[in-house]
Amino acid sequence: MCIRDRLTDSSVLTGLANEQAFASASARQVRALGSSGDVLLVMSVDGNCANVQQAIVAAHEREMVVIGLSGHGGGPMAQSLRDTDIHVDVPHERTARILEILMLVLHCLCDAVDAQLLGEQEETNR
């Protein structure tokens, strides 16, 4: 489930923000769209984002697994993860470096999902 695409859609974001605080925008979408066995991927540089924390709570209510990507130890986000969840923390102080590594992790995850769904394919020289 991709919440980010929905949060960058200005009409969805405006509607959610008008109804309730922005901090619960992702949690509302997880509750509406998430199911047991789904995986929620969240990312927060320092783990202090209330929106992310509430989405994790909503995912756990739905018996979903959460993959949390963060830096600075993950803060409250990391503390809200369960033993069955996955936490990837970038041990660096500079936000720019943390974001660069988290983007690399996201690309690696996408590649792994592609390999699982489509099988290993050799790239040809262009």
Regions found by a protein language model. Name each.
Residues R4-E123:
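Glycine-rich phosphate-binding loops that contact phosphosugars or nucleotide phosphates
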Residues R126:
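N-terminal loops that bind phosphate or other acidic moieties
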